[in-house]
Each structure stands twice: as structure tokens, then as C-alpha cells.
Amino acid sequence: AHLNEHMLFKGTEKRGAASINNLLENVGGELNAYTTKEETVVHATVLKEDLRRAVELLLELLFTSTYPDKELLKEREVVYEEIISYKDSPADSIYEDFECRLFEGHPLQYPILGTRKTLSRIESSTLKEYLHKWFIPDNMAISVVADMEESQVVKIVERALRKYCPGQHCDIIRESTPQPLVAGTAGGRTAAGEAAPLDWTPVPPFRIEINKKHHQAHCIIGTRAYSYTQERERLALALLANILGGPAMNARLNTVLREKNALVYTVEACFNPYSDTGLFTIYFGCDKPLVERSLRLVRKELERVIEAPLSSRALANAKKQLLGQLAIASDNSEAQCLSMGKSMMIFGYIEPMETTRSKIESLTSSELQRVAQEILAWDNLSILIYK
């Protein structure tokens, strides 16, 4: 999927790589893409008068890419360098290493970038087969944020679809009644659209220390968590992650490890839901002799949220902080566009901000405590340390 994302920009039935790059850049636009564990996203930012140009180019890339052999040879080397660069950054590579170990036996164990061995086996024919299997309209969502009349946008998109996907119709999604998700059906679909069954036995909690030639130690503490289908628990854990290690300087772990004890520069808590499982992690980097003390303080903070419910004031403040962060993020048109597309792919609808706000506001301290007890119990957590 990741190599395919790179190769989409290397040639279509009517354009070479340079022409693809120039088409939007010549009018001040941007064209980019990224791959996650469960999706590929190709996106463009342009002036509204250039929307047609952008939409047609995106569909041209997705449906008529040719994967020239000479470009594939070069792009393999580019991805090799990307892998090396990633491995040279322990703060990044430890996340990948942790997921590989935590999700052993599950598709999530595989690194997005691949390996030199797996990349060497991928030929142009492999990528073409992948394109025709997965890049079909039933697997896609087109998201547009623009200061334009909806009818104008629909006309542009449907015209491009007729050009590159004859017979395909554009279903317009505004606000709709959410349908209950079934575990395993958000993302992770087969080419025919049905849920891909998984036969997977989770690995038991582990603690692994790996000697690395780095000046600093890096540590991840984490566990499997909730999927997209578990809405109340997912929202509660997202709020807990923000309380413990969100971007604010007053996050609890940052206050204890950095501000009070000067043990770390960076500490963060992250929750990533997937279609059939999820991942909760806490990461910090510190001087090697300080690892155990830092771990003890992290454990103490986790035990605080497990043993005692948040006060009504602390809960209200935490909700206000998260809602403020979400509102500010939604002011970014590109972020809003990407979020809408992801919501369509996962849930089949776009949730208004007011609905999200109401759901977060309705969370109770007892719900957060129950989620903390289920996910954050120390004996359930796995630990990976680069020393």
C-alpha cells in the first residue's frame, strides 16, 4: 500500500511524473498522499477556481496509474532511504517496533513502510493488481471543503467520475442517521466489501529491553484498546489520553515527569482506534539511569485515575480542554477535509461537531474510571525500552 502510494505520482496513461507534479504546483496548489495501517489518502489543496483540475488529477492517479518499471526501480530506493531514516530516529521507530510485538500474528504487526525484502518482491504487475483490486469506487470516499455552492462541487466531481469511472454515481452525504457498527467492519474490508475475518490470539503482556547506541533511553508502555465500534469507551479513552499525556503542558504526565521532576523533555499518551482493535501508548525519552524512576511515576499516575474518579470540576475542565482543541483543529480546512473523508470511510456518515460535543459532554467520571481500570492496569501493560 505504501509503495503504491509513492508510485501513484510516477505516471498515468497520459502524464509522466513531471507533468503530474506541475499540474497543481503551477497554480500554487499542493498534491500529497499518506498511508496508515488501514487507509491510503491522496489529497490536494488548491484555489477554488482550480478544484476541477485537482479532482480530475486525483481520479486520474487513482484509476489510470501505469507504474513504469524504471520509476519503480528508483522509487524502491527512495523508500529504502525512508526506512533507514525512520530507523535512525528511535523516538519514531520504537512505535513501529512496539506494534510489531504487541500485534504479533495480526495484520497490524506489519510496518507501513515495509522492509527491503518485501519491497524487492514487488513488481509493476503486483501494483497494478493491487490498484484494480482495492482502488474501486465502492472502497472510496471523496471529501471536499470549499467556499462553493454544493451543486458546483457535485457537478465537478460527477463530471470527473464519468471521465474516469463510467457508470459510477456520486452519492452525497450530509448528516445521516448513524448505523451501529459491527466489530471488524470499519475499515479492514476485503475487495468485495465484506468484513475480513481474523483468527488472532493476542500476545500476553511483555517487558523487553533492547540495547541501542543512543545517548537517550526511549520507552513505550501500552496495550490493545478499543476499536471504532466501541463508541462510549473509545471517547472515554480518548479523553483519558488527553488528560494524561495530551499536547497541553498541563497534562498530568508532563506535569509530573517534566515540570516537577525534570526527568524528560517529551512524554505523550496516544490512543489509536482501528477497525477491530485499538492501541493505547505512553511514550517518553529520558537519560538512561532515569528510566525506572520515570516508570514508577507513570505507574503512580495511572493508578490515580484507576483508583479514584475525577472530581466534577476536573472532569469539566478536561472536557472543555479537549473540545477546545477539537474546535481549533476544525478551523484548518485541510484537516477538516481529511477528517470528513476518514469518517465516511469508517462510519458511513459525517458527524456534526455539535453531536461530537454532546457525546463528550455526556461522559461521566465513573465511565472514565471503568475504562482506566480495563485498559490502564499496570499488569496488563507491555513495556518496550531502548537503552
Question: What is the predicted function of each stretch?
Answer:
Residues 172-178, 182-183, 192-250, 343:
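His/Glu-based metal-binding/catalytic segments typifying zinc-dependent metallopeptidases
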Residues 1-24, 98, 221, 232-244, ...:
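Active/ligand-binding-proximal structured segments within catalytic/core domains
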